[in-house]
């Protein structure tokens, strides 16, 4: 098979949702259909010990939440599928945002009882900004939920995206009978030995069922007043195909997967800092690091840099350029993943995700190129933390482990490090409280370094150019610090302190991140 044919087989997507909408469960079912697992771990895992296969970190298994992005790959129906299962918890949205830079489509999982929730809305805005296709799976039809028409209306009003139902539920909860499949022109039955039936058999199967009569009325209404199906509108991110189903009972999931792969896009190009777009079919290898993860295998204390292959083909042992440093690197020890399990990979093509063993060479956002190519891809989003804590080693004899742990966990990008200009104290910044809890848990469990953390409350953060800095600008209303790249930064007590500073130093430019 030619390189172009291999690339065109790739389908790389992320699954996004609010916590508890069923994202991890549907990921498990997709892996089940891909033949990667014999049984899907379920949300019952916290009690049974039968943990989700895509949740590998110890704290994820304890709490039943996803706080890191997992990468999984399988072959299905002539396609090579790359799934990125993202953190649903809001405190880890920064990791999710970066992951969304590495995919060509997104699957949005919505709880049928709750509709569009806060985190779903935030993540959708990032997806919308990138203009990548969004496929919606409305989950938990095995439970009572909201009216399907209400859910479609909410998609359009809250998210501002047109929707087109690919199937329609017949009943819900205890009255759930199956799906009216508009796309495949068939019925998918929830009970009984036969899974599918023709639409002509509907009256015989459901003739006296009031829910079936309601379905026919709804479908007639949608035909008159609903949106038209358009494959181009899907690819442009203007129309979301909507699928109903139940991930927990594995109903409607395979139909979703089949139809998703029919319409999901091939790998797309990525913009460079100069505005050029690198074509995935370009034979020269290029890629970017969108995530760094320490201790995926705690026995080996390893670090993996996750790379999205943007163009061409990776071959094991190849030499690459790292434009940020002006140096080169050799990609010898490279893996692909199924959650925590991994295997060495000899080659990969545009659209694939590979894991490069990292000894401190890479940073999130790094571009990798070959030959004379020295371009860099557009930078990944970074976020200004909102809450802060002082952190120190509980045991002074563990300083070496403490510094190693802090360095590696901060490089993952889920938490940010600052150093007080005057005192040298370490301070951590995060978007939410859970990030601190995970940091403390991992420092103790993975680096054997207990930490003491003291809350500093919320701060307003602004960066300042080194040439504008005067240490006399520091006052009781702010803390002067350095970030992990040694760039000067002020942590202001509040917005009033920021305005006071801006009035006092009108010529000093303060920069805010996303």
From Swiss-Prot:
Transmembrane recorded as keyword: no
InterPro entries recorded: EF-G-like_DII (IPR053905), EFG_III/V (IPR035647), G_TR_CS (IPR031157), P-loop_NTPase (IPR027417), PrfC (IPR004548), RF3_C (IPR032090), RF3_dom_3_sf (IPR038467), RF3_GTP-bd (IPR041732)
Stretches assigned to the tr-type G domain: 8-268
Keywords carried by this UniProt record: Cytoplasm, GTP-binding, Nucleotide-binding, Protein biosynthesis
A Pfam family reported for this protein in Swiss-Prot or TrEMBL: EF-G_D2
Principal subcellular localisation of the protein: cytoplasm
Coiled-coil regions listed: none
BP GO annotations: regulation of translational termination
SUPFAM superfamilies according to UniProt: EF-G C-terminal domain-like, P-loop containing nucleoside triphosphate hydrolases, Translation proteins
Keyword Cell division (UniProt): no
GO cellular component, one term: cytosol
Annotated positions binding GTP: 17-24, 85-89, 139-142
Subcellular location: Cytoplasm
Alphabetized GO MF terms: GTP binding; GTPase activity; translation release factor activity, codon nonspecific; translation release factor activity, codon specific
Gene3D superfamilies in alphabetical order: P-loop containing nucleotide triphosphate hydrolases, Peptide chain release factor 3, domain III, Translation factors
Family per record: Belongs to the TRAFAC class translation factor GTPase superfamily. Classic translation factor GTPase family. PrfC subfamily.
UniProt function note: Increases the formation of ribosomal termination complexes and stimulates activities of RF-1 and RF-2. It binds guanine nucleotides and has strong preference for UGA stop codons. It may interact directly with the ribosome. The stimulation of RF-1 and RF-2 is significantly reduced by GTP and GDP, but not by GMP.
Name used for this protein in its record: Peptide chain release factor 3
Upper lineage: Bacteria, Bacillati, Bacillota, Bacilli, Lactobacillales
């Amino acid at each position: 098979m030619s390189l172009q044919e291999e690339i065109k087989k790739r389908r790389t997507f992320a699954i996004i949702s609010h916590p508890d909408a069923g994202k991890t469960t549907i990921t498990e079912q997709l892996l089940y259909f891909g033949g990667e697992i014999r049984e899907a771990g379920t949300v019952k895992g916290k009690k049974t010990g039968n943990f989700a296969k895509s949740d590998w970190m110890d704290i994820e298994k304890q709490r039943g939440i996803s706080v890191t992005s997992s990468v999984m790959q399988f072959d299905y129906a002539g396609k090579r599928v790359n799934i990125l299962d993202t953190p649903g918890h809001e405190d880890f949205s920064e990791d999710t945002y970066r992951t969304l830079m590495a995919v060509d489509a997104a699957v949005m999982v919505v709880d049928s009882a709750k509709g569009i929730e806060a985190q779903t809305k935030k993540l959708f805005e990032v997806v919308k900004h990138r203009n990548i296709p969004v496929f919606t799976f409305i989950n938990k039809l095995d439970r009572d939920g909201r009216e399907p028409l209400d859910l479609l209306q909410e998609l359009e009003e809250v998210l501002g995206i047109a929707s087109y139902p690919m199937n329609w539920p017949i009943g819900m909860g205890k009255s759930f009978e199956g799906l009216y499949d508009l796309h495949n022109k068939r019925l998918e039955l929830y009970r009984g030995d036969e899974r599918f039936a023709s639409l002509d058999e509907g009256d015989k199967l459901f003739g006296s069922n009031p829910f079936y009569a309601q379905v026919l009325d709804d479908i007639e209404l949608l035909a008159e007043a609903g949106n038209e199906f358009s494959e181009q509108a899907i690819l442009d991110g203007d129309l979301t195909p909507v699928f109903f189903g139940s991930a927990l009972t594995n109903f409607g999931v395979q139909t979703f997967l089949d139809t998703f792969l029919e319409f999901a896009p091939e790998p797309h190009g990525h913009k460079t800092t100069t505005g050029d777009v690198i074509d995935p079919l370009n034979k020269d290898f290029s890629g970017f690091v969108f995530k760094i993860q320490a201790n995926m295998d705690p026995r080996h204390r390893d670090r993996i840099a996750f790379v999205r292959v943007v163009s061409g083909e990776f071959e094991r042992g190849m030499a690459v350029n790292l434009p940020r440093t002006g140096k080169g690197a050799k990609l010898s020890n490279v893996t692909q993943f199924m959650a925590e399990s991994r295997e060495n990979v000899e080659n990969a093509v545009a659209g694939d995700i590979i894991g490069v063993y990292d000894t401190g060479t890479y940073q999130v956002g790094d571009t990798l190129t070959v030959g004379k190519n020295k371009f860099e891809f557009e930078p990944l989003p970074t976020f200004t933390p909102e809450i802060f804590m002082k952190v120190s080693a509980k045991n002074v004899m563990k300083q070496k482990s403490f510094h190693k742990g802090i360095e590696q966990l901060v490089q993952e990008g889920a938490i940010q490090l600052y150093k007080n200009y005057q005192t040298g104290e370490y301070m951590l910044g995060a978007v939410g409280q859970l990030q601190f809890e995970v940091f403390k848990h991992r420092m103790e469990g993975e680096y054997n370094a207990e930490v003491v953390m003291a809350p500093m409350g919320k701060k307003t953060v602004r960066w300042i150019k080194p040439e504008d800095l005067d240490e006399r600008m520091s006052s009781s209303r702010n803390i002067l610090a350095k970030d992990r790249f040694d760039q000067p930064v002020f942590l202001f007590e509040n917005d009033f302190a920021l305005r006071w500073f801006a009035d006092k130093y009108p010529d000093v430019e303060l920069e805010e991140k996303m």
